[in-house]
């Protein structure tokens, strides 16, 4: 899992049927920008929790996605 900040959204007029109805966000992580499928209704400026890789594809019923926003982070603290 990774934490990132939503910096924008991605729109498309046409996309694969398996992505129909999906919203995509641009998320800045410590490793750079990623495009992630949004499952929680996050918006610009929100700090979010991402799952990536094979877990992300399984979470979206094997849709061809590399990252999924699964939570909006309310706060963090050091152990």
Range-by-range predicted roles:
Residues 32-37:
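Short alpha-helix capping/helix-loop boundary micro-motifs
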Residues 27-29, 51:
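Short beta-strand-to-turn element immediately C-terminal to the catalytic PLP-Schiff-base lysine
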Residues 1-27:
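N-terminal first-folded block
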Residues 11, 48-49:
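Generic structural signal for buried aliphatic residues
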Residues 49-79:
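C-terminal structural segments of small proteins and small subunits
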């Amino acid at each position: 899992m990774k934490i990132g900040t939503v910096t924008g959204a991605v729109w498309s007029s046409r996309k694969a049927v398996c992505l129909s109805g999906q919203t995509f966000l641009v998320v800045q992580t410590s490793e750079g920008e990623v495009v992630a499928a949004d499952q929680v209704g996050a918006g610009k400026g929100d700090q979010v929790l991402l799952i990536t890789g094979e877990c992300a594809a399984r979470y979206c019923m094997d849709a061809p996605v590399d990252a999924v926003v699964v939570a909006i982070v309310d706060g963090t603290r050091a152990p």
